[in-house]
Swiss-Prot record:
It is found in: Nucleus. InterPro entries: bZIP (IPR004827), bZIP_plant_GBF1 (IPR045314), bZIP_sf (IPR046347). This is bZIP transcription factor 53. Expressed in developing seeds. GO terms for biological process: cellular response to starvation; hypotonic response; positive regulation of DNA-templated transcription; positive regulation of seed maturation. Belongs to the bZIP family. It comes from Arabidopsis thaliana. PANTHER family: BZIP TRANSCRIPTION FACTOR 44, BZIP TRANSCRIPTION FACTOR 53. The gene is BZIP53. One of its GO terms (molecular function) is sequence-specific DNA binding.
Amino acid sequence: MGSLQMQTSPESDNDPRYATVTDERKRKRMISNRESARRSRMRKQKQLGDLINEVTLLKNDNAKITEQVDEASKKYIEMESKNNVLRAQASELTDRLRSLNSVLEMVEEISGQALDIPEIPESMQNPWQMPCPMQPIRASADMFDC
């Protein structure tokens, strides 16, 4: 609407007061725009700094988590190895028990005396089956050193 007023009042074009007011408005608008641009740059700079800090924190967290996963993997491999050793020992002991039981059966046949020969427990024949129902084990998180 300001441009319409400028066209409708031809005497204002030559009026130095009008030119001064217009120049003053342009100067104020230019200063305001500069200040707004400066604030915008400051906001962007702060956002960039915040994002850089967040990236640093996330990288640190990622490194810690990776370290924990590696440690847990090592412990898992160690436990798996121990478990395999225990399974092999259980199998060997089961075989030895069978062998001893067969010797006892031969002694029983030869001597004619009845011997109390224990049967091999089901849990020894099928080690993946628990001999008794599973009961919850209470343990604290500190116990695992994760």
